[in-house]
């Protein structure tokens, strides 16, 4: 994740409310000694124009911070250009742009959208309106859920009338690659917003139960499912809890999308319920380690029950 301010800044130019930073400006900012009292504002490099606020230094890989973005790349330029294009295209205005600069966005999600846009076989590449909608969803600026047509993409490994399951290949990414050679993760998006027939849901549950029984099906509350290794669920819980509390502070009316509990891993559904009821993180996470009965509404002949020794892999 990185704040929008790591890519662009509000401006008041003819036809533009936001402008992007250059790589040269970022390099200058990373090497400059800057008073802390000025760290929350874009830094004037005197030579290359404005650079991101120094408070976000750790978001960039300067050679000593491998967890930061690899900003000195063509991919950084593409993502920054895309964000500026979309925000200026909707005529966001300088004041509104200033309000959203601190909004965190998924760098990997945006890089995947670039790959979709560059793929001439993908419908996204030829539809400017769909591109705009996909980016605004990725930024959290509209309430629409990430559906299959607006998804970040990946390799499709399963699809039926209601759902599409994507294998996420973050290991080959440029900006923030995942270096764990054992990383495997999937995302399931809805194909439409209409009610989905039980038969279609059962097809998905059966696929997950028998083909992905070493994985937990969870949700981050954004209208899609995540299929992750049991050993990573605790880390996902930390991130989801932190993100939920952060969003709730900015927007008390925010609604966490719990999705279909027949698909979600029972323990994760319990974790989410406890989080939404105001329980502390540690208390909520204990439910991830507790043996639970499968959802009573699960489909006949298909179970999402997990063995206790599988749950104990949580770390």
Swiss-Prot record:
It is found in: Host cytoplasm. Its EC number is 3.6.4.-. Transmembrane segments: none annotated. The keyword Mitochondrion does not apply. It is an enzyme of class 3 (hydrolase). GO terms for cellular component: host cell cytoplasm. The active site is at 224 (for ntpase and rtpase activities). Pfam families: Rota_NS35_C (PF02509), Rota_NS35_N (PF21067). The keyword RNA-binding applies. GO terms for molecular function: ATP binding; metal ion binding; nucleoside diphosphate kinase activity; ribonucleoside triphosphate phosphatase activity; RNA binding. Keywords: ATP-binding, Host cytoplasm, Hydrolase, Magnesium, Metal-binding, Nucleotide-binding, RNA-binding. Homooctamer. Interacts with VP1; this interaction is weak. Interacts with NSP5; this interaction leads to up-regulation of NSP5 phosphorylation and formation of viral factories. Interacts with host DCP1A, DCP1B, DDX6, EDC4 and EIF2S1/eIF2-alpha; these interactions are probably part of the sequestration of some host SGs and PBs proteins in viral factories. HAMAP family: ROTA_NSP2 (MF_04089). Belongs to the rotavirus NSP2 family. This is Non-structural protein 2. It comes from Rotavirus A (strain RVA/Turkey/Ireland/Ty-1/1978/G7P[17]).
């Amino acid at each position: 994740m990185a704040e929008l301010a790591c890519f662009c800044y509000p401006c008041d130019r003819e036809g533009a409310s936001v402008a992007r930073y250059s790589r040269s400006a970022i390099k200058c900012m990373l090497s400059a000694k800057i008073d802390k009292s000025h760290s929350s504002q874009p830094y004037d490099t005197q030579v290359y124009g404005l650079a991101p606020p120094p408070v976000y230094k750790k978001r960039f890989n300067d050679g000593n911070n491998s967890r930061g973005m690899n900003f000195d790349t063509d991919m950084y330029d593409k993502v920054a250009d895309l964000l500026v294009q979309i925000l200026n295209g909707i005529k966001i205005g300088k004041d509104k742009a200033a309000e959203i600069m601190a909004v965190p966005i998924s760098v990997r999600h945006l890089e995947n959208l670039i790959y979709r846009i560059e793929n001439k076989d993908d419908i996204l590449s030829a539809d400017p309106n769909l591109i705009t909608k996909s980016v605004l969803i990725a930024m959290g600026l509209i309430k629409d859920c990430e559906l299959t047509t607006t998804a970040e993409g990946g390799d499709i490994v399963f699809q039926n009338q209601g759902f599409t399951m994507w294998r996420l290949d973050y290991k080959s990414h440029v900006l923030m690659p995942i270096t764990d050679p054992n990383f495997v993760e999937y995302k399931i998006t809805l194909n439409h917003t209409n009610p989905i027939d039980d038969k279609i849901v059962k097809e998905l549950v059966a696929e997950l139960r028998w083909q992905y029984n070493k994985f937990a099906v969870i949700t981050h509350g954004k209208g899609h499912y995540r299929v992750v290794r049991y050993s990573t669920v605790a880390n996902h819980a930390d991130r989801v809890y932190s993100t939920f509390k952060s969003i709730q502070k900015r927007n008390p009316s925010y609604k966490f999308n719990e999705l279909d509990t027949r698909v979600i891993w029972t323990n994760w559904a319990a974790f989410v319920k406890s989080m939404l009821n105001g329980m502390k993180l540690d208390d909520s996470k204990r439910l991830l380690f507790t043996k639970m009965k499968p959802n009573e509404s699960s489909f006949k002949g298909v179970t999402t029950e997990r063995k206790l020794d599988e749950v104990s892999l949580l770390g």
